[in-house]
């Protein structure tokens, strides 16, 4: 739904399947935010979101977690982002639930740093591109 809603709002969405031997094991979606999706729901977007790339979704099937697929997917997503498909940007941001310590640790290990902003109830972390 998020990729569909992004069309026509000034945002671009790039969905990717995460596969092992041609079998899907997860999903990742990159977004670029020119005008915020938040205008649709009256929330003020985090400042780091405007004019920057985001990893909107990262999901790995439970059977394939703790095998490096998430870390590799993030690395490949950042490689893709650095081709500047929507133009240059300063940051890539990602957000996560505060109680999801595993996600927070993964994102920090990939270079993301929490910046004190929140996206709804989620913590925002950014990586300088």
Where are the regions a protein language model picked out?
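Conserved active-site alpha-helix within GNAT-family acetyltransferase domains
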Residues: 71, 97-116
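Active-site acidic-Proline motif in GNAT/NAT acetyltransferases
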Residues: 61-63, 67, 98-99
